[in-house]
Amino acid sequence: YCDFSKVFIKNQPVDSYLEHLLEEFQSYDIQKLRTLYIGGGTPTALSASQLEVLLKGLTKNLDLSVLEELTIEANPGDLDADKIAVLKNSAVNRVSLGVQTFDDKMLKKIGRSHLEKDIYENIDRLKLAGFDNISIDLIYALPGQTMDQVKENVAKAIGLDIPHMSLYSLILENHTVFMNRMRRGKLPLPKEELEAEMFEYIIAELERAGFEHYEISNFSKPGFESRHNLMYWDNAEYYGIGAGASGYVDGVRYKNHGPIRHYLSAVEEGNARITEEHLSQKEQMEEEMFLGLRKKSGVSMIRFEKKFGRSFEGLYGEIVRDLVQQGLMQIDGDRVRMTKRGLFLGDTVAERFILE
């Protein structure tokens, strides 16, 4: 279900990879960052000493007084006491755990190596080490999953007493085991109506527990929104570092070489990128809408006009009025945003903002 760049760590040149990744990072001469996010991939698969090399290398030239958030992703099965000690002694101030589900049978089915007990152990250890900004990822609409199982997962997640959760419905990516099984008719996924019911239940329960549904898939207690992801949904620019990473800098969307050995050679030659795409103003405006409408707060029409020097009304007025009439969008002052129904139909609504 996950199409990130991934490799088995065994027999991989891990130390050499870290060295090259840090070389790529340093080539940008970055001194000030508001957010840094390590993961999409699992950095805690590294040994404690390798993790320390990575964290020190990334932060040694950074002005930490302006770094608001440093998130690291972790697998519940990987976080031992040594690795937590490394995190504690670094600039990391937010940890995101790939829980996915609390059901041991389902974890095995989706190829995860951790168990439910590891989730509780890891969160207790992180809290004891002083981490209060903890997030978990959960997946719903898993193969054969029932509404009762979703209810149980949500109750257990709320019981963890953490300030942030990301909940994603299972999306099948090409070239993954799940997609191959579905094509062979061997994957009993919940029907769309049940998936919608699951999503509505999740929103209602988490809001009742004091979480704000601030983006299609994300819920937080006040003040604990993911700053890194908000920057991304605001269509701000970001560097992507490492094998298979994507970035968006100076109006250029780029992607790095994926296979590790190709990436190592590319860094040695002085350019890790395999593709670069210069976005036109039309494409930038479309992205502003696609990404911004994922947020509960939506898109500011004033900010849009300042950024692009174009009339929002002239470009999108008619489309917005039509979506408002259908109950999928609403206008609040200078902002346009999705209704709850619109959020569930996210991509279908966003497609209306493709400019001819």
Task: List PLM regions with ranges.
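Short, amphipathic alpha-helical interaction segments positioned at domain boundaries
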Residues: 341-356
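Minor-groove-contacting beta-hairpin "wing" of winged helix-turn-helix DNA-binding domains
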Residues: 335-339
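Short amphipathic alpha-helical interaction segments
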Residues: 310-324
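A short, conserved structural fragment
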Residues: 324-334
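Local cysteine-cluster metal-coordination motifs and their immediate loop/turn environment
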Residues: 1-4
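C-terminal scaffold of the Radical SAM
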Residues: 7-28, 32-310
